Amino acid sequence: MAKLVEKFYSIMGLGDEIEEMNDASVAPHSGEERESAFSRRSAERAERTERPTAPVVSLVTERQKKELKVVVCEPKTFDEARAIADHLKNRRQVILNLEKADREMAQRVIDFISGTTYALNGSMQKVGANIFVFAPSNVDISGEVTGDDLSSVRSPLAWANKG
């Protein structure tokens, strides 16, 4: 049986190590030598496992700072709508002020940006006369501005009052 075990160890490439281990275990050691050998091994293991510590950066905080940006846009032409849509794609909130825009251009911009918002699973809220908030999916808009709150401000965009 011993030959079978030795043969198995030699196949596995462990034959020489077992002989060395047996020789080492037979040699008598004093108590101090055992303690020093043990402490030396544990110190070596500790050195191998210790890694230099690096400063820890909180990724959540950095990510939240990026996501909390709000972009205020007041487009003069429809061509600026694409840049506004890019802000939403980059997960930034957009406040769109169309008070100075002509009706046709404002309607086209609202249609384009609301389509982008829908495609990105975002949300849209009217907060004033011709002022809208568009938010990506990572931001929830809470609260509603009722028609009574906006009654003092006359909106030239009748279609925007439907909410």
Swiss-Prot record:
Gene Ontology CC annotation, any one: cytoplasm
Segments for region (Disordered): 25-53
GO biological process, one term: FtsZ-dependent cytokinesis
Top-level taxon of origin: Bacteria
Cell compartments where the protein resides: Cytoplasm
Record bears the keyword Cell division: yes
Biased composition (Basic and acidic residues): 30-51
Keywords from the named record: Cell cycle, Cell division, Cytoplasm, Septation
Matches recorded under Gene3D superfamilies: SepF-like protein (3.30.110.150)
Entries under PANTHER family matching the protein: CELL DIVISION PROTEIN SEPF (PTHR35798:SF1)
Assembly behavior: Homodimer. Interacts with FtsZ.
Primary role: Cell division protein that is part of the divisome complex and is recruited early to the Z-ring. Probably stimulates Z-ring formation, perhaps through the cross-linking of FtsZ protofilaments. Its function overlaps with FtsA.
Family: Belongs to the SepF family.
Protein name: Cell division protein SepF
Organism annotation: Heliobacterium modesticaldum (strain ATCC 51547 / Ice1)
Taxonomic lineage: Bacteria, Bacillati, Bacillota, Clostridia, Eubacteriales
Gene (name only): sepF
